[in-house]
Design a protein with these regions (language model features):
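Generic alpha-helical transmembrane segments
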Residues: 708, 753, 774-788
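C-terminal catalytic subdomain
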Residues: 756
Length: 865
């Protein structure tokens, strides 16, 4: 018999558990018996296959063809060295791919879903993979269901099972027994792994985990998530292909020019001409570009993770630098998320948090703590901060919540949702069933018939309503969040939203969630950086405005409005309306999407924060969706590009700063690589047009491109971050990474290095062509190593600490310098890399000319400054 056909008591008995859950020992035994609650992963690619895939790159294929033709034409040494260097690059690429997979696995581990289980009679938060058969799992709106289970307690739970059944509408769940065989979609007393709760709450007993779940049985049919290339990577790939095609065209022209100049065409002439063309191709193609960008993005992602921002989609790393609007929630993000009750209002009196409270006034506090889902166990507070504040206030005034909950057990409920802005529960108090409701004052004020007093109760008059609204406004203007607490008698525990009326008012509770200490500074940083912070909250307009003014989001030039103000505006009207609004209060998820879309239509890059299941559409709509790691639902995290592990607005600003620096570092690395390649191209073209011998062999350029260029480029990618990036305006949305400024730098610096290289060639040519080639190669190689220091900043770096603040760059220069000198001085390597021995004077000339490139570029930077 299937669990859905059995009584819940029988299911519990069959699984050896009860409503208090498993003990920790039982859970560990069951984990050994049933295994971890995770799907078997698809086989990862064999490292050898990964190695072979490195040869699929378009640029590498061109080099392989060049090597093969070189070998056929008799230049065996060049062919062998090209293959060796390409192989080394393939090995490095394979190792980097494996490391990237490991990094991705660690990030997945950091953002793994959790579950609330009852063990040893207490609610505990555990990783989803540690849930086991027999566990009692608490499911609330926004939670993913991480295993299959039978519902044993239900409070209006609705579940999105579209991942399992394809049904787009949420399914209403129940706990009653079902008769006969039922298809998956009709098993309404079961919950299945991969679905998520959209409304209400429930408890279930886990019946199967891992590959035994329904989703596990069809796991082979599920699409695995694959990391797509980011827009930057795609752009650079396309750039590389276009560059290659252009270079092939130029190579054909050079080949034709060389053949045209010759007296007659024979194998030797063709071989020499082809060597020229190959040298040009190798000089132009930035072999390491793609892998270096990947490495820099990977390192940047790890750095962001260490600073509490987990990147879930790699393109977010690039997008962070362009963010111009941050739409942020208030509670927990801009504030501390540590609500404390400051004042209560009862029967015309405002009572301070530290004043004595009598029994009548205490009933207001007790009702607030009973109509409440928060839990306190072993010093850990689980639940909504507002509800935790009510419980803490009750305990502070010697009204023990656990005893009250045992005495007045909850028999029914209507969970809170952002549309109703209310929560209701039913308890038996004395001989009567009482429905307790807490929620927004503006929602409840029109549903009150009577008011509790020190002497009993009386009718709720127009004067009472005016007083209630007045006190609510006063509290809100103080930046306090206000809840009304009401009660009424009911005849049954089966309540519905239609019963939420005809209340007796107990009073108001005013609490405060103070701003985080760092919020004001983060807002100031945003404004300096040309980023506009906007508060979007479900809270009261006056409360939101008070906090926004305190931290600097709202000033005399900004407006604060309620969400309903935008409901009747057309998209065109909304585009105009959003321009001067800094605070939106009482917003719905639909409002959030419209606000984000309006700014996007105006050409801005928008970041949006969210935590609830209803925030998922807005998070997906935003350019950078940011989910809360602590309070956020699994659905929100799944929709987001980035997850904050500390729920802190300041972390978003830090992430933007890191994103800007990362993008700038990638620009520096690209500028470094392409300016060096430009120098090589110019040198080869100059030699061709001047009918000089080819200045480099292919092996020389490959040595530079793949060995001595890669390390400085990676070092530039991890250049220490500069805070001055937050003094700049956001990068335009569709701006190419190869801006006019970067292209100018590439051309100018390429010319400088190219000129120095050809000077070295002419100096060496005094002796012979082999020495000329060796000096040109050495100067180009060392100039590019020195040029790494030029690319650290747009400003001069000589005589500054910035020159030496990157240990990776110093190390890269040292390694490259040692490798170059080994090639020049070790006889065996001289033969392999086709270099001639140099005299001390020639070697010093190479050093001097290479240093000259640094000096000239630094002088040009000073002139430009």
């Amino acid at each position: 018999m299937n669990p859905y056909q059995m009584k819940k008591e029988d299911v519990l008995k069959m699984l050896g558990t009860d409503e208090n859950g498993l003990t920790q020992n039982q859970a560990e035994e069951n984990q050994k018996k049933y295994g971890k609650n995770e799907l078997a992963e698809g086989k990862k690619k064999n490292p050898f296959i990964l190695f072979l895939e490195q040869y699929k790159d378009f640029l590498v294929i061109i080099l392989i063809i060049a090597a093969i033709i070189s070998g056929v034409l008799g230049d065996i040494e060049s062919a062998i060295v090209i293959f060796v260097v390409i192989t080394i690059n393939a090995i490095l690429g394979t190792v980097q791919h494996i490391k990237a997979e490991q990094s991705l696995d660690s990030l997945k581990e950091m953002s793994a879903p959790t579950a609330k289980v009852i063990r040893d009679g207490e609610i505990k938060v555990v990783e989803g993979k540690d849930v086991t058969v027999g566990d009692i799992v608490v499911i609330e709106a926004g939670d993913y269901v991480c295993s299959d289970g039978r519902i044993i307690e239900n409070a209006s739970l609705k579940v999105d099972e579209s991942a399992m059944t394809g049904e787009s509408e949420p399914v209403e769940k129940q706990e009653t027994v079902l008769d006969g065989e039922k298809p998956l979609g009709d098993r309404v007393n079961m919950l299945y792994s991969g679905s998520f709760a959209t409304y209400g709450r429930a408890k279930m007993v886990v019946t199967s985990v891992g590959m035994e779940t329904e989703i596990g049985k069809i796991a082979s049919l599920l699409k695995s998530t694959q990391e797509k290339k980011t827009p930057l990577q795609e752009s650079l790939d396309n750039f590389g292909k276009k560059l290659s095609l252009i270079i092939i065209g130029i190579c054909v022209i050079v080949l034709g020019l060389e053949l045209f100049r010759s007296d007659g065409i024979n194998l030797t002439v063709f071989t020499d001409a082809f060597v020229f063309a190959v040298a040009l191709a190798v000089a132009a193609i930035p072999e390491a570009l793609s892998s270096i960008v990947t490495i820099v993005l990977s390192v940047g992602t790890q750095k962001l993770a260490k600073e509490n921002a987990i990147i879930r989609k790699l393109q977010a790393v690039e997008g962070l630098g362009s963010v111009s609007i941050i739409c942020s929630d208030k509670t927990g993000t801009l504030t501390q998320n540590k609500m404390t009750v400051q004042k209560i209002y009862f029967d015309g009196q405002i009572i301070d948090k530290d004043d004595e409270i009598n029994a009548r006034q205490g009933q207001l506090i007790i009702d607030g703590a009973l109509c409440n889902d928060s839990v306190q166990k072993e010093g850990q507070e689980i639940g909504d901060p507002t509800e935790i504040a009510l419980v803490n206030f009750s305990e502070k005034h010697n009204l023990p919540v656990e005893k009250m909950r045992e005495k007045y057990q909850r028999l029914g409920e209507i969970p809170f949702d952002s549309d109703r802005k209310l929560m209701s529960t039913v308890h038996k108090i004395g001989d009567n069933y009482k429905m307790l409701t807490k929620g927004a004052v503006d929602v409840l004020s029109g549903r009150i018939n009577e008011v509790k007093t020190m002497d009993g109760k009386r009718p709720f008059t127009a004067e009472d309503l005016a007083e209630l609204k007045k006190v609510n406004t006063e509290f809100s203007q103080m930046g306090l969040r206000v809840l009304a607490v009401c009660e009424r008698d009911v005849d049954t525990v089966d309540i519905s939203v239609e019963d939420e009326k005809n209340y007796i008012l107990l009073g108001l509770v005013a609490m405060q969630d103070p701003p985080r200490e760092e919020s004001a500074e983060a807002v100031r940083k945003c404004k300096t950086a040309g980023i506009r912070p906007i508060m979007i909250t479900g809270d009261h307009l006056v409360t939101a405005s008070a906090i926004a003014r305190k931290i600097g989001i709202l000033d005399d030039n900004g407006r604060a409005v309620e969400g309903r103000k935008i409901e009747n505006l057309s998209d065109e009207e909304l585009d105009e309306f959003v321009s001067d609004v800094s605070v939106y209060a009482r917003v719905s998820p639909e409002h959030k999407i419209r606000i984000v879309s309006a700014w996007q239509r105006k050409g801005y890059i928008v970041s949006m924060t969210g935590d609830g299941v209803n925030d998922a559409p807005a998070l997906k709509q935003a350019d950078i969706g940011v989910a809360m790691g602590i309070t956020g639902s699994e659905v929100a995290k799944d929709a987001a590009s980035m997850v904050l592990t500390d729920d802190n607005f300041a972390t978003i600003v830090k992430a933007i700063e890191n994103g800007r620096n990362l993008y700038r570092n990638i620009q520096r690395a690209i500028q470094f690589l392409l300016s060096g390649n430009t120098a090589g191209i110019l040198a080869v073209l100059y030699a061709s047009f001047m009918a000089l011998p080819v200045p480099f062999k292919a092996v020389h350029l490959l040595f530079i491109n793949l060995l001595t260029d890669s390390l400085p480029a990676i070092a530039l990618g991890v250049e220490p971050h500069s805070s001055d990036v937050m003094n700049e305006k956001p990068r335009p949305k569709n701006q190419s990474i190869l801006t006019k400024k970067v292209l100018t730098n590439i051309c100018v610096e390429g010319v400088v290095i190219g000129v120095m290289t050809m000077i070295a060639f002419y100096v060496g040519f005094i002796r012979n062509a082999e020495v000329a080639s060796t000096m040109a190669f050495s100067t180009l190689c060392l100039s590019r190593l020195v040029h790494g220091f030029n690319c650290k900043s747009d400003k001069p770096v000589w005589f500054t600490k910035k020159m030496w603040n990157n240990k990776s760059m110093i190390g890269a220069f040292f390694v490259g310098f040692v490798l170059l000198n080994a090639v020049l001085l070790v006889p065996v390597l001289q033969g392999i890399f086709a270099v001639a021995p140099l005299t001390i004077a020639e070697l010093l000339t190479v050093y001097g000319l290479s240093l000259g490139t640094f000096v000239i570029v630094q002088i040009l930077k000073m002139i430009r400054k």
